Amino acid sequence: MKIIYAPCVLFCVLLTSGSGAAQSPAARTAERMRELIRVLDLKVLPKESGYLGIVGVSPQKVVVHGKPLAVQSQNYYMLTDTLPINYLHWLEPADTHILIEGGPVDYFIFHPDGQVEKIVLGMNVAKGERPIVAVPGGCWKALQLHKDARYALMANALSPEFTPDRVRIGEGAAWVKRFAGKAEWATPEFLRVMIGPNWKP
């Protein structure tokens, strides 16, 4: 009897393990991440990195530099363990990020007056994390997913709406010199990492 049924037992075990009936937490997280990317139609964002999904713009308008723009534009944005950094960029509009799921994320803000901030975008408010980060217009910023996180899905609202002519991606040596040493984490090496592939010689 043992010889007859052993192959059947082995076959059933293999079927069960391959069917996803007993998925590990890591497998469930990876599946959830893929589901969000698919359902929300997120696409890899060139230069800045991460995944972006356009939601829309508000019907209200405001005039900026002589052009009518929507008061606000809204997007989904995601970082993953394979695309963990939103590389340094400057935005003219104000930008607000709201954590929907996952994280936490380190949020680095560089103000035009030379001040710097590091805010942890996350749900553990008892540890100082914040589920919303609001960045004034005219700042540089970069985001980095925590190493123990698989992904972070965020909503972001830009006011007035985002347009490609009001963003600058990357910086160079003069920018690094300007902000290096403004905080313990703001080393030249780390700032260079946050600029990433968009280094301007």
What are these regions (language model features)?
Residues 1-4:
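Positively charged n-region of N-terminal signal peptides that target proteins for export
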Residues 20-22:
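Boundary at the C-terminal end of the N-terminal hydrophobic targeting segment
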